[in-house]
Structure formats: C-alpha cells, structure tokens
C-alpha cells in the first residue's frame, strides 16, 4: 500500500481580499514525483507557500506524514525534513559555493555534513569545481544547481522545487531534470512546480493542472501529456 507523504485538503488562500486558491486538494505519495503545472498567476507558488506558512491557508488543511502542519511555523516545518528550492534561486551571493552548502547543512552532525556535501558534489560536479567561487559570480544554471544542492544538504524526505527551469538554457534544463530523475531513483519524494509542462510531465508519476486557483485536471504524467486540452494550453498544440 502506498504511503501518502503530503496532502492538501480543500486548501484556500488569500492575499488581502483577493482569493488566490479555491479548495485545492492534491496528494503526493512517498517516492513519487508529482508536478503542478499552470500558467503564470494560476496559484502554483501560492500553494507551495501554504505549505511553508506564507501565505497561511485561510481554510482547509496541509498534512505532512500524517501531521496537520497547517499552522506550523516555517522553521518547524523545515525540521520535519522538508526542503524548498524557491523560484529565482536566492543563493547567498557573497558567500562561496561551499559556504552556501554549509548553510543548508547547518544542523547536520559533522560526520553527516561531510557525507552530504560529498554526495552533493557527486550530483553536481561543477559545484565541486567552483567550491571556492562566490555564488553571485556564477551563471544562472550554476546558481540553480547550488540552490538544489543547498536544499539537499538538509537531507529532506520531501523536496519542493519551484520553477527550477526558469530562465535557463535548454542544455542546463536537461541537466537539472536529469538530476531530479536521479533523486527519484534514490527514493526522494519530490513536488515539482513548473511552467515547462513538457519536461515536467515526462518526468512526473502524476500531475495536476491549476487554473485561476482551481485544480481542473489530474492524472498520470503520461496521460496529461496525451490530453488534447493540456497539449493545446501548455504544450503548444
């Protein structure tokens, strides 16, 4: 029997008087990649925000590993082995690559820290090559690798990725998605929010389509790729 890792149960959210999410329900099973696709302004990043408490859900529940975390503080949620790679990367630009990774592994024991950083360097050899370089001088693709690596330093059970392909060259996008596939093969549970619907659905076990704050469709990744409405709206026909 599949174990459910994360559930959004009829989650609504507001920015002031504007309702951004309307009774959104979805779930992610352990070991899955689940993707959420939708146009700009559909509410994808807002839904991720309700998991981390920004914004808080105005109604409904967010449940992680059987625990209702709807009203938890962000720091407490992160201690539950949840890590997020935010849209726009947000690396510490004046710190070196290795210092950025150290921030991600701040709570790790020293032996565990060395093990994690070695693993991240194996996933992203370029980070090892540039480990003493300041993050702000790196390319967008390298910064995205660093943002993912930093999140992985906390040894998460659930990894949240918000638009990891945004603004990147096609060859770098493929490298990022290849790494996401590797993480799934190693048993990590991944919630992928992505505008690049074609790449995301090829990778995903299951997917959801969000429009104007409503889930309008859900199915396997392959089925959504073949869906005529999805192809017309998000895959260029």
Curated annotation (Swiss-Prot):
Q: Does the keyword Acetylation apply?
A: no
| Origin: domain of life | Bacteria
Residue span(s) of domain ABC transporter: 6-237
GO terms of biological process kind: L-amino acid transport
In Pfam terms, one family for this protein is ABC_tran
Alphabetized, the UniProt keywords read: Amino-acid transport, ATP-binding, Nucleotide-binding, Transport
Output the SUPFAM superfamilies linked to this UniProt entry: P-loop containing nucleoside triphosphate hydrolases (SSF52540)
| A single GO molecular function term of this UniProt record | branched-chain amino acid transmembrane transporter activity
Task: Please list the residues that bind ATP.
Answer: 38-45
* Zinc-finger found in the keyword field: no
Similarity field: Belongs to the ABC transporter superfamily.
Q: Which NCBIfam families match?
A: PRK11614.1
Q: What does this protein do?
A: Component of the high-affinity branched-chain amino acid transport system.
What name appears for this protein in its UniProt entry? Answer: High-affinity branched-chain amino acid transport ATP-binding protein LivF
Q: What is the lineage of its organism?
A: Bacteria, Pseudomonadati, Pseudomonadota, Gammaproteobacteria, Enterobacterales
């Amino acid at each position: 029997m599949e174990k459910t890792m994360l559930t959004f149960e009829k989650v609504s959210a507001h920015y002031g008087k504007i309702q951004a999410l309307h009774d959104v329900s979805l779930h992610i099973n352990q070991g899955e990649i689940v993707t959420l696709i939708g146009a700009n302004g559909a509410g994808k990043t807002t839904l991720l925000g309700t998991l981390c408490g920004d914004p808080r859900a105005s109604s409904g529940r967010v449940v992680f590993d059987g625990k209702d975390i709807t009203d938890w503080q962000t720091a407490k949620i992160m201690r539950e082995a949840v890590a997020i790679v935010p849209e726009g990367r947000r690396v510490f630009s004046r710190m070196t690559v290795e210092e950025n990774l150290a921030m991600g592994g701040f709570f790790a024991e020293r032996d565990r820290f060395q093990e994690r950083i070695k693993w991240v360097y194996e996933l992203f050899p370029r980070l090892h090559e540039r480990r003493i370089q300041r993050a702000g001088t790196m390319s967008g693709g390298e910064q995205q690798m660093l943002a993912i690596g930093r999140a992985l330093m906390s040894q998460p059970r659930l990894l949240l990725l918000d638009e990891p392909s945004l603004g990147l060259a096609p060859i770098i996008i493929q490298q990022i998605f290849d790494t996401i596939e590797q993480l799934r093969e190693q048993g990590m549970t991944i919630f992928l929010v992505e505008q690049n619907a074609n790449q995301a659905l090829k990778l995903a076990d299951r997917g959801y389509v969000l429009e104007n704050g409503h889930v309008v469709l859900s199915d396997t990744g392959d089925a959504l790729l073949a869906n005529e409405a999805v192809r017309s709206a998000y895959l260029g026909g």
